[in-house]
Design a protein with these regions (language model features):
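Sec-dependent signal peptide recognition
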Residues: 2-8
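C-terminal motif of bacterial Sec signal peptides marking the signal peptidase cleavage site
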Residues: 14-15
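Acidic, metal/ion-coordinating pockets
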Residues: 19-333
Length: 335
C-alpha cells in the first residue's frame, strides 16, 4: 500500500524540524570553565530558557499539511517536542502572519491557524512577532495574528493593535520559578510596508529602545533579554550594525541578546563584564527552525538553552546549543 511504502516520506513531508544533534555543545564550557553547571541548585532557584529560530510557512509546507478537513501539523515537532518541554520558557520567532485565507507562503506569508495551534501544543509558551513579515497581510493580518495568539493565552512581544495595548503589555514581563524576565523585541523593518495606525510594530530605533530599557529596569527584573530581528539574509557573519547594536544594548542594561532574520546560523558570544563579572549571551542569528528554504545553510538552525540561577544575585550559570535540521516537503509517488 502506498501509505506504508511512503511512511518515511510522510513523516518528513511537512518541512519541519526533524532531529537535533545527539551531543549538546556547551557554549559556556567552550569559553569559560568558571560557568559549569555542576553545582547543586534547587529547581526554584533555576530558570531554563530555550530560544529557537524562525517559524515559517512556505507554500510547499502549507500544501503538504493540507488534509480533507483542514491542515495537520501534528508531526511537525515530533523529534524536538521533548526538548522544548524541558524549558520553563520556550521562546520562538513567529515569522508569518495568521491573516486568514487565502493561505500563502513567500513573499507575503499567511499561515493556517492550525500552525499556531501546533506551535502551542509543542510547548512554546512565548512568541516574538516583530519581524520583516509582520505586515504581510496589512492591518487586518497584524490584528488577526495578535488576536489568535491571545486566544491561546501565549504571551508575546513585538507587535500591537494600538498604543494602549503596547503601554499595558510592553516590555513583556515573564514571571516563572520566582524569576522576573523583561523581554524586548524589535525588527529592522517590514519590507517597505508602512504600519497602519493605530497598529504598532517595534522598529529598531535606539531612542525608543533606550526608553523601553529604562521602563524594563523600573520593574526590577532579574534579566532583560532583547530579541532582535536584524542583519543581512544568508550571511554567516554579523554585520557592523549588529555588532554595534549588541554592544549598545548591553551598555544600556540588556543582559542577553538573541538575534534572528539572516536564516542562517551566525556566531555566539559570551561576554564578561570587566567590572561586575556578569556574563552576557549574544546570539547573532539562530537560523531557521521550521521553513522550506533551499538556499545554502538555510536548512537548519540552533536551539539555544540558557540557565539562569538565583542566590544572592542572578547569573548565567550554563548555556548550550543543539543543531537542528529541517526536511523539505516531498511529494508522494503513486505506484
Amino acid at each position: 500500500m502506498k501509505h506504508s511504502l511512503f511512511l518515511m516520506i510522510l513523516l518528513l513531508s511537512l518541512s519541519c524540524t526533524s532531529r537535533s544533534q545527539a551531543k549538546r555543545d556547551s557554549i559556556i564550557d567552550t569559553l569559560s570553565d568558571s560557568l559549569s553547571a555542576t553545582d547543586s541548585i534547587s529547581p526554584t532557584d533555576t530558570l531554563r530558557l530555550l530560544f529557537v529560530g524562525d517559524l515559517m510557512q512556505h507554500q510547499g509546507q502549507i500544501n503538504a499539511a493540507r488534509t480533507s478537513t483542514g491542515y495537520d501539523y501534528s508531526t511537525c515537532f515530533t523529534y524536538v517536542k521533548e526538548e522544548i518541554g524541558r524549558a520553563d520558557l520556550a521562546i520562538a520567532n513567529l515569522e508569518v502572519t495568521l491573516g486568514g485565507k487565502p493561505y500563502k507562503g513567500y513573499p507575503a506569508f499567511s499561515a493556517p491557524d492550525e500552525f499556531l495551534t501546533a506551535i502551542h501544543d509543542a510547548g512554546f509558551n512565548v512568541l516574538v512577532t516583530a519581524n520583516n513579515h509582520s505586515l504581510d497581510r496589512g492591518k487586518s493580518g497584524l490584528e488577526r495574528t495578535i488576536q489568535l495568539i491571545d486566544s491561546l493565552k501565549i504571551p508575546h512581544a513585538g507587535t500591537y493593535i494600538n498604543t494602549e495595548e503596547r503601554d499595558k503589555k510592553y516590555p513583556l514581563l515573564l514571571e516563572k520559578n520566582g524569576f522576573r524576565i523583561a523581554l524586548l523585541n524589535y525588527t529592522y523593518g517590514t519590507n517597505g510596508i508602512p504600519v497602519t495606525p493605530p497598529n504598532i510594530v517595534n522598529y529598531i530605533d535606539t531612542t525608543v529602545i533606550a526608553k523601553d530599557i529604562e521602563e524594563s529596569k523600573a520593574v526590577k527584573p532579574d534579566a532583560i533579554i532583547a530579541c532582535m530581528h536584524w542583519g543581512i539574509e544568508y550571511q554567516s557573519l554579523p554585520d557592523k550594525e549588529q555588532k554595534f547594536l549588541a554592544d549598545w544594548l548591553i551598555q544600556k542594561g540588556v543582559n542577553h541578546v538573541i538575534g534572528s532574520h539572516p536564516h542562517v546560523v551566525q556566531p555566539i558570544e559570551v561576554r564578561t563584564d570587566s567590572v561586575t563579572n556578569d556574563k552576557h549571551l549574544v546570539v547573532y542569528s539562530l537560523g531557521n527552525y521550521i521553513s522550506n528554504m533551499s538556499a545554502r545553510r538555510t536548512d537548519g538552525g540552533l536551539m539555544v538553552r540558557m540557565e539562569l540561577v538565583k542566590d544572592s544575585t542572578v547569573r548565567l550559570n550554563n548555556c548550550e546549543y543543539s543543531l537542528v535540521w529541517t526536511a523539505r516537503p516531498l511529494s508522494l509517488i503513486h505506484i
